[in-house]
UniProtKB/Swiss-Prot annotation:
Stated name of the protein: Cytochrome b
PROSITE patterns registered for this protein in UniProt: CYTB_CTER, CYTB_NTER
Function of the protein: Component of the ubiquinol-cytochrome c reductase complex (complex III or cytochrome b-c1 complex) that is part of the mitochondrial respiratory chain. The b-c1 complex mediates electron transfer from ubiquinol to cytochrome c. Contributes to the generation of a proton gradient across the mitochondrial membrane that is then used for ATP synthesis.
InterPro entries: Cyt_b/b6_C, Cyt_b/b6_C_sf, Cyt_b/b6_N, Cytb/b6-like_sf, Cytochrome_b, Cytochrome_b_C_euk/bac, Cytochrome_b_N_euk/bac, Di-haem_cyt_TM
Coarse class of the protein's main subcellular location: mitochondrion
GO molecular function per UniProt: metal ion binding; ubiquinol-cytochrome-c reductase activity
Binding site for heme b b566: H89, H188
CDD domains: cytochrome_b_C, Cytochrome_b_N
Length: 371
């Protein structure tokens, strides 16, 4: 056991004995964050935030910089791994009732919003065709804001179109926001351990606890090893698996792709945006697709904390997961039948989960009371 008092406190942290592998994703997210900051720093050393040179600087990093290809692929695929872990982390929180720890949940959603902003700014930086179009399309949504929209968009772009000032400020934001994420993560962990984590049964964990180290630390280490192994296999053998073919071409404002397709981890929100044939309505739906997670602690009406013994909520939860996957897939397709109706149906089902949660809680309470 380490002798430094902070490390000793961390090692002796009391944790419920019955938390499963689903509780490992917090430490995996911390590892992803460290990896992103390290690889991002080495990429920033060689990157040029200039509209004419950005694409060339990425090629230079990949071809000429020693292990530049590794840094670039680790950073790009590491971002996908980050989002896989965070989506599983959120799903686990919804399933096992972790959202009832309100302060921790709210800080977590703030973290998610900051992470999405950071990833979006990073996606624009390579200066590829799809990066340019995604930046133009998404930032242009600000014009839907009444009265202030056009001014806000011009201010964000630093001009009347995406150009050098846009890339410079996006690079600055992409560089600084990870430090905000680190600070928010510290706050998230402090708030979590003030009350303690939940467990699969939703019972009071104070009855039976064990030290975090060595029991849970070694359990975390197993999944961490598997995650890093998966990451290295993907980087080594399938480095372009998440890349869009259009992004291998330098940004050309005179050429428009068939349809805008952001990175896969934005597609569920983009699919919801695209399913509404109105600019302001779509922009509001896009924001609500994330912000509606904040309502989860307020709409929990069931007597039981987790969904472990709540069959109706389980059915709705797995509908949400399948909806999330379907809307992600539909958002990769052109805006034409049948993808339009699929997007609209799945967008409706996505919001239905959060609206139906309190009703299902009341029904399940009645069912339990009648037994």
């Amino acid at each position: 056991m380490p002798h430094h008092y902070i490390l000793t406190l961390f090692g002796l942290l009391p944790v419920a004995t019955n938390i499963s592998t689903w509780w490992n994703f917090g430490s995996m997210l911390l590892t992803c964050l460290m990896l992103q900051v390290l690889t991002g720093f080495f990429l920033a050393v060689h990157y040029t935030a200039n509209i004419n040179l950005a694409f060339s600087s990425i090629i230079h990093i990949t071809r000429d910089v020693p292990y530049g290809w590794l840094m670039q692929n680790l950073h790009a695929i590491g971002a996908s791994m980050f989002f896989i872990c965070i989506y599983i982390h959120i799903a686990r929180g919804l399933y096992y009732g972790s959202h009832l720890n309100k302060e921790t949940w709210m800080s977590g959603i703030t973290l998610l919003i900051t992470l999405i902003a950071t990833a979006f700014f990073g996606y624009v930086l390579p200066g590829g065709q799809m990066s340019f179009r995604a930046a133009t399309g998404i930032t242009n949504l600000l014009t839907a804001v009444p009265y202030l929209g056009a001014t806000m968009t011009t201010w964000l772009w630093g001009g009347f179109a995406i150009n050098d000032p846009t890339l410079t400020r996006f690079f600055a934001l992409h560089f600084i926001l990870p430090f905000a994420i680190i600070s928010l993560s510290s706050l998230h962990i402090i708030l979590l351990h003030e009350e303690g984590s939940s467990n699969p049964l939703g019972t009071n964990p104070d009855i039976d606890k064990i030290p975090f180290h060595p029991y849970h630390s070694y359990k975390d280490l197993l999944l961490l090893t598997l995650m890093l192994l998966t990451l290295m296999i993907t980087v080594s053998f399938f480095p372009d698996i998440f890349n869009d073919p259009d992004n291998f071409s330098k940004a050309n404002p005179l050429v428009t792709p068939q349809h805008i397709k952001p990175e896969w981890y934005f597609l569920f929100a983009y699919g919801i945006l695209r399913s509404i044939p109105n600019k302001l309505g779509g922009a509001l739906a896009l924001v609500m697709s994330i912000m509606i997670l904040l309502t989860a602690p307020l709409t929990h009406t069931a007597h039981l904390r987790p969904m472990t013994f709540r069959p109706l909520s389980q059915l709705m939860f797995w509908t949400l997961i399948s909806t999330f996957i379907t809307i992600t897939w539909a958002a990769t397709k052109p805006v034409e039948p049948p993808y339009i109706i699929i997007s609209q149906t799945t967008a409706t089902l996505y919001f239905t989960f959060f609206i139906s949660t309190p009703i299902l809680g009341w029904i399940e309470n009645k069912m339990m009371n009648s037994c």
